Swiss-Prot record:
A cellular-component GO term for this protein: cytoplasm
Positions bearing N6-(pyridoxal phosphate)lysine: K234
Subunit structure: Homodimer.
Organism lineage string: Bacteria, Thermotogati, Deinococcota, Deinococci, Thermales
EC number: 2.6.1.1, 2.6.1.78
Protein name per its UniProtKB record: Probable aspartate/prephenate aminotransferase
PANTHER family: ASPARTATE AMINOTRANSFERASE (PTHR46383:SF1)
C-alpha cells in the first residue's frame, strides 16, 4: 500500500467530535457519566419541520438538487438574511450547503492560494485553522483574553495584518467562549477588511441564542468583502439534517457551488424542503427558538451560579450554550484537569484545541438535573 497523502496526515481530527464520541462510548459501557461535551441542542427538531420532511418524502422530492441548493430555499435564505440581518442579497448571492461546516470548507477552498493568511481569533472553533491549512492557507492566531472578557482588541488584530492576509474569521456568538462581540468591535473589524481589502468571514450560527445584548452582522458594512455563514442546526435543533447556508459576493458564492458540484453534488433534498419550512413558517419557528433560548438562559444561570458557589471561575457568556471554565483549581493544565473531571464522572472538552489554554469547555445544552449533578461532582473533585 502506498499510504496516505501528506495533506491528510497533517490534518487533525475534530477534538470536539472525538471527546463527545469517547463520552458516548463510556456511557454505552454503563459508566455513570455526565457529558457536558456536545455542541448541539438537546431538543428535538420542531414538529412542523419534521412534518415538512415527511411531506417531501411523500411527494417524491428525493432527486438530486442543484449544487447551490433548491431555488425555493435559496429565496428563503435570501429573505432571512434581508429581514433578520439587514443584508441586501439576492438568491444568486446565497448557497445551501451540507451544514455550516461545508460552507466554510468550500469558502476556504474557493478563496485561498498556498501561503495566504487567515486571521483567526482565539479561542476559536477547532475546525477553522484545520480548514485553512487544508486549503493551503496559513492560520494566524490573534488572542482574546479572559481578563478582557474574550472580546477582540481591534488594534491587536490590526497588528496581525500583512500583505498576505486574505481573510479574517469572526464568530459571534462565539464557540467556545459564548461571548457576543460588541457592535463597535465588529464595525472596526469590517472597516479593516475594507481598508486592507481582505475577506471578512462572519460565522453567525448561534445568532438566535443571545441572552444579553444584540446580534450585529458586519456584512451590512462591507457587503462586497463579507461572507456570512449560518445554518439550521443550532436555531432549529437540526444538527443531523446537515443544512447550512451562506451569502456573499456572487463570484465567491459561484466558486463555492463549483466546489460542491465536484464533492457532495448538493445537500440532502428532503432536508432542504424541511429547512424551507423552518425559515418560512416564522410563527412556529420563532416560538420554538424563544422556548429553547429561555431554557438555555436558565441553564446558563444555574451553571454560572453553581460554579461561583464552589469557587470556580468562568467568563460570563452572553450567547451560544458554552462556558469556558478556568481549570487551575483542578490541575496544572487543561488536559490533566479534563482527565481528573472524567474520573469524577463529568466529561468536558479540554481547551487545548480551541487555543483556550487553562480552560475546559462546558456545554449546557443538557438538562438542569445533569448540570446539578455535574456541579456536585466538580465540588467533590476539588476536595
Amino acid at each position: 500500500m502506498r499510504g496516505l497523502s501528506q495533506r491528510v496526515k497533517s490534518m487533525k481530527p475534530s477534538a470536539t467530535v472525538a471527546v463527545n464520541a469517547r463520552a458516548l462510548e463510556l456511557r454505552r459501557k454503563g459508566v455513570d457519566l455526565v457529558a457536558l461535551t456536545a455542541g448541539e441542542p438537546d431538543f428535538d427538531t420542531p414538529e412542523h419541520v419534521k412534518e415538512a420532511g415527511r411531506r417531501a418524502l411523500a411527494q417524491g422530492k428525493t432527486k438530486y438538487a442543484p449544487p447551490a441548493g433548491i431555488p425555493e430555499l435559496r429565496e428563503a435564505v435570501a429573505e432571512k438574511f434581508r429581514r433578520e440581518n439587514g443584508l441586501e442579497v439576492t438568491p444568486e448571492e446565497t448557497i445551501v450547503t451540507v451544514g455550516g461546516k461545508q460552507a466554510l470548507f468550500n469558502l476556504f477552498q474557493a478563496i485561498l492560494d498556498p501561503g495566504d493568511e487567515v486571521i483567526v481569533l482565539a479561542p476559536y472553533w477547532v475546525s477553522y485553522p484545520e480548514m485553512v491549512r487544508f486549503a493551503g492557507g496559513v492560520p494566524v492566531e490573534v488572542p482574546t483574553l479572559p481578563e478582557e472578557g474574550f472580546v477582540p482588541d481591534p488594534e491587536r488584530v490590526r497588528r496581525a495584518i500583512t500583505p498576505r492576509t486574505k481573510a479574517l474569521v469572526v464568530n459571534s456568538p462565539n464557540n467556545p467562549t459564548g461571548v457576543v462581540y460588541p457592535e463597535e468591535v465588529l464595525r472596526a473589524l469590517a472597516e479593516m477588511a475594507l481598508q486592507h481589502d481582505f475577506y471578512l468571514v462572519s460565522d453567525e450560527i448561534y445568532e438566535h441564542l443571545i441572552y444579553e445584548g444584540a446580534h450585529f452582522s458586519p456584512g451590512t458594512l462591507a457587503p462586497e468583502h463579507t461572507i456570512t455563514v449560518n445554518g439550521a442546526a443550532k436555531a432549529f435543533a437540526m444538527t443531523g439534517w446537515r443544512i447550512g447556508y451562506a451569502c456573499g459576493p456572487k463570484a465567491v458564492i459561484k466558486a463555492m457551488a463549483d466546489v460542491s458540484s465536484q464533492s457532495t453534488t448538493s445537500p440532502d433534498t428532503i432536508a432542504q424542503w424541511a429547512t424551507l419550512e423552518a425559515l418560512t413558517n416564522r410563527e412556529a419557528s420563532m416560538a420554538f427558538i424563544a422556548m429553547a433560548r429561555e431554557a438555555y438562559r436558565k441553564r446558563r444561570d444555574l451553571l454560572l451560579e453553581g460554579l461561583s458557589r464552589i469557587g470556580l471561575e468562568a467568563v460570563r457568556p452572553s450567547g451560544a450554550f458554552y462556558v469556558l471554565m478556568d481549570t487551575s483549581p483542578f490541575a496544572p493544565n487543561e488536559v490533566e484537569a479534563a482527565e481528573r473531571l472524567l474520573m469524577a464522572g463529568v466529561a468536558v472538552v479540554p481547551g487545548t484545541e480551541f487555543a483556550a489554554f487553562g480552560h475546559v469547555r462546558l456545554s449546557y445544552a443538557t438538562g438542569e438535573e445533569n448540570l446539578k449533578k455535574a456541579l456536585e461532582r466538580f465540588a467533590q473533585a476539588l476536595q
